[in-house]
Amino acid sequence: MKKLFLGAAFVLALGAMPSMAEELTVITAGDQNMVDYINNYLGPMFEKENPGTTVRAVGTGPGDAGSQKIIERLEAQKQAGKDKWDVDVAVVHEKAAGDLVKDDLLKKYRADIPTGKLVSRENADMALGTDVKGYVMPMFNSQTAIAYNPALVKNPPKSYDELVKWVKANPKQFGYNGIKGGMSGVAFVVGWMYAYGGDVKTLENGPYKKGETADWSKALAALKDFNKNVTMTPGNAGTLDMLARGEIAMGPVWVDMFYTWQASGQIPPDLKLVLLAPGMPGQPMHYVIPAKAEHPKLAEKFIALATSPEVQANGIVKKFNWYPGIDATKVEAKLDPATWNKLFTDIKPKELAQYGKPFPIKPYFDGILEAYEKQVAN
């Protein structure tokens, strides 16, 4: 009887114990703030909701080079024939997401998580010409826009056509960095080509037609003429500096950088933003799950938390001034009015969905930069 009692007690004790501890490994491209965000904010939240689980984030470095290291890591494990890979979740740039899908290195999971249906932007389905629908969830969307000084610009242009007229009437008051010193200038040039260089959908998604770049001569000649009346800035930070000093009245910026500088007092609080029609590019960072992740279900739970309206509101928008990866209208209820108004007063969610564009597919993107050097910069 005593033995039976002890045995029952032992079984009950086992039942009360937490399940076997699991470690979720997340690797992320990008700056150190990406690693810190997961290790210091998102990871502890997930661990609290999933007792016994540990989240470990490792960074691979900024830019496409950081994402390339993730591709190489997964490719090596695939080539080695491993049954389970040592990465559960990866955070990659847009181009890498397409390459990972093409190389059969990812699991299709978006339809299996509750937040999958909250995605609204087309860059979650197409990544620089590659169909990635179902394989990615955007962590956030970064976006370029035109910053302007309302004291100097009473009625800001709403389109590239209106901007051309404004610059002609206000020479040297618009500034950008060309294609040197930062992607804000590159994004402005890409937006110009979307407006005047041919079919936007083809530039965004392909197929690439080699001879099409020859049709850009008119658009590039117009840009060269436009540049005669603009001020060339030293880069992303240089454009903001010149706006702050009143040396220019308007110029392209990264929205998150704009708001970060505004919060720190580096630029005046009354500067505003406008997103030009037919659109300007930005780019997301994507959550992906490797095809043979050791903990795929846990990875899905992690990404569902990371892309929930609450986390998108408090983590992505409040902490970093990024636009949410999911539909912004789903995030509004989770934000205090001041934070929402700061991010969406100038550029409404509807405008962001309509005019926030991806960058072109690589052959067109490279072609635009090369053509700018040859036909505009010289």
Residues covered by each model-derived region:
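Early extracytoplasmic/lumenal segment of secretory-pathway proteins
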Residues: 22-94
